[in-house]
Amino acid sequence: MADWARAQSPGAVEEILDRENKRMADNLASKVTRLKSLALDIDKDAEDQNRYLDGMDSDFTSMTGLLTGSVKRFSTMARSGRDNRKLLCGMAVGLIVAFFILSYFLSRART
């Protein structure tokens, strides 16, 4: 950068400044290329994540429908009378026991 101060003729100063300008333009072009590549990578990643989130949204929507139906059936069964309350309690205890047994076997399978 200080080479232009040592130049003897005005033509040499212009040549040195021109070379420095080209070098800086090349550096700028390489930085712009890297930024463009980075922006494209971010865009691709954002699109992938949006697709993933859309898939999760449809999964949660279907799960919500399934759980809503189960809760309605469970509520109907709970309101149906005293005879079914023993059955309901037995089913609840059975589901809890099944959950703990399943979690025990899954934890043993991982270790």
UniProtKB/Swiss-Prot annotation:
Cell compartments where the protein resides: Golgi apparatus membrane; Golgi apparatus, trans-Golgi network membrane
Disulfide linkage: none
SUPFAM superfamilies (UniProt xref): SNARE fusion complex
t-SNARE coiled-coil homology domain boundaries: 15-77
Record bears the keyword Cell membrane: no
Transmembrane segments: 87-107
Lumenal topological domain: 108-111
GO cellular component, one term: Golgi membrane
Chain positions found as Phosphoserine: 9, 37
Entry keyword set: Coiled coil, Golgi apparatus, Membrane, Phosphoprotein, Protein transport, Transmembrane, Transmembrane helix, Transport
Membrane topology: Single-pass type IV membrane protein
Cytoplasmic side: 1-86
Entry's Gene Ontology BP terms: protein transport
Keyword field contains Protein transport: yes
UniProt subunit comment: Component of a SNARE complex consisting of STX5, YKT6, GOSR1 and BET1L. Interacts with STX5.
Its biological purpose: Vesicle SNARE required for targeting and fusion of retrograde transport vesicles with the Golgi complex. Required for the integrity of the Golgi complex.
Protein name stated in the entry: BET1-like protein
